[in-house]
Amino acid sequence: TGKLLFPKEAVLDWINKDSIITGKGQLTITGSHDPLLEAVLRQTSIDIATMWNGSSAGLERVASGKASAAVIHIFCPAFRSWNIEPVKTTCADKDVVLLHWAKRSRGLVMKPFVALHVSSLSAIRPYRLSQRQKGAGAQILFEHLLDEASIRTEQLELTATCHTELESVLALLEGKADIAFGLEHYATKYN
């Protein structure tokens, strides 16, 4: 599930003053690529910069003061929960607010001929698989699911390393991969 991470002071200022978040320099949203947020931002007249660099990198940028907000969806296997523990750890001394933004529907996105042969995660081994960059929420979750299925990444043919949800699915259309761990939104859009 995706979350947006904002500095608490900025949220309270926005609520109390009925204004947009302001601060030093450019308002920047970083972290996980979120197609819904991207569409919403395109419809606004607010000057907001985006940097889709993955959940973990986005969280680090907020913690270091280099970003105004981060879109994150980081599964924490030890707690079987999303986002809270990584935020507590990374932003322990920061004044931040964690807001629920949206739920993501994700799974294996496959070329049609592959879908005929893959009915479980264990059946992906012979196929080329696009992957997300280290620290991306999707990659963290996928590696957890592989671990639960007793599959090591060394057993897979990993091809393209993709930096956005869209890139991950486009790798299939471009012939770089047969399977991606991606969003239902893009699977439906590019089917």
Feature annotation, model-predicted:
Residues T1, A123, A187-N191:
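Short, intrinsically disordered, charge-balanced linker/junction segments flanking boundaries
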Residues A39-S45, L121, R132, A138-A160:
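Ligand-binding cleft/hinge of the Venus flytrap
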Residues M110-L129:
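Flexible hinge/capping segments at coil-to-helix
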